[in-house]
Amino acid sequence: MPQGKPNILVIMSDDIGIWNISAYHRGIMGGQTPNIDLIASGGALFTDSYAQQSCTAGRAAFITGQHPFRVGLLKVGMPGAKQGLQDKDPTIAELLKPHGYATA
């Protein structure tokens, strides 16, 4: 990666709440997330969060930067369904790769 480019770390999870992250619950709940806590201690804790109505819609919105309605992914899709990302829909990975980022 070229010098001067910021690191981008995405942590995406499914079906958790703020109290599942120990940096937020500060020992009140049972689960521990030491690696996320380490990141939080050197940065910032967010107080607001937003989500789509389903995990599929949330992933589609993040991957494409578009409202899930535009790409037809409002709820969990089924194998063989017509809805889904099309070749014309660029993804965040496709847009970052030409700028020197390693993407998966």
PLM features: what roles do these ranges have?
Residues 1-104:
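Formylglycine-dependent sulfatase
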